[in-house]
């Protein structure tokens, strides 16, 4: 059979990421080597290209969860084995693939589905926008002013001829007719000192029963951004 040895490099330490990927490696007949935040000083103690070359010699695949998206790009360019993007400050592609599968499981299709993201225009939103530039989507990002997603990524997604992409600050109209409501934490890693201030700014963007009255369905990533709404 195919030998599968995976190297996990998690600079942003998260239990769910480690468990899900290590379980996946195991079920595919391989095993994982975990390198935590203190094991590699990527871009500091160790050059990214050197890390990529060394790990490529010992492993069949590299899964990295990093702070800096530039490090992910350099890692993939320097490695001689496949590199899986487990998360960066710019995007989170594996999460979105899992979300699409969840939507499909509950709705039997991803066609003609309106997805509304409510909250901070962060790496999750960038991933949805990247997806909208590849496959047809009806996607709305509902966020406070000043918390919009990456402008270049928005432009790229809007320039497609097959996706409907909207960025809005109007809560009432933004969620109207939504089939899927998606939310995330208001203060991501590295922003915890802003948590109290963000809680005030995002208070009107909390997913709750009042908001859900204008939608067709509910799908939530539960956090402080969600209150009393039942999840699918």
Which functions belong to the PLM regions below?
Residues 15-23, 111-161, 166-173, 177, ...:
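Glycine-rich phosphate/diphosphate-binding loop of Rossmann-like nucleotide-binding domains
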Residues 1-6, 11, 221-232:
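Single conserved hydrophobic/aromatic residue that forms the stacking wall/gate
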Residues 72, 125, 190-191:
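Glycine/Thr-rich phosphate-binding loops of Rossmann-like dinucleotide-binding domains
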Residues 158-223:
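Rossmann-like adenosine-cofactor binding region
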């Amino acid at each position: 059979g195919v030998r599968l040895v995976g190297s996990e490099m998690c600079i942003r330490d998260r239990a769910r990421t480690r468990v899900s990927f290590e379980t996946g490696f195991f079920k595919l007949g391989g095993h994982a080597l975990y390198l935590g935040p203190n094991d590699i000083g990527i871009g500091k103690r160790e050059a990214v290209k050197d890390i990529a070359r060394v790990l490529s010699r010992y492993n069949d695949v590299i899964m990295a969860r990093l702070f800096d998206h530039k490090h992910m790009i350099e890692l993939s360019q320097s490695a001689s084995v496949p590199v899986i993007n487990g998360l960066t400050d710019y995007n989170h592609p594996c999460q979105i693939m899992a979300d699409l599968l969840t939507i499909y499981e509950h709705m039997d299709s991803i066609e003609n589905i309106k997805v509304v993201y409510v909250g901070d225009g962060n790496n999750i939103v960038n991933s949805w926008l990247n997806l909208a530039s590849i496959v047809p989507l009806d996607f709305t990002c509902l966020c406070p002013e000043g918390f919009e997603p990456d402008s270049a990524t928005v432009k790229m997604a809007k320039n497609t001829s097959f996706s409907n992409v909207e960025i809005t600050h109007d809560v009432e109209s933004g969620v109207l007719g939504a089939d899927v409501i998606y939310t995330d934490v208001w203060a991501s890693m590295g922003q915890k000192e802003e948590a109290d201030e963000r809680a005030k700014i995002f208070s009107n963007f909390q997913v709750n029963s009042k908001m859900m009255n204008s939608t067709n369905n509910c799908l939530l990533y539960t956090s402080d951004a969600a209150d009393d709404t039942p999840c699918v």
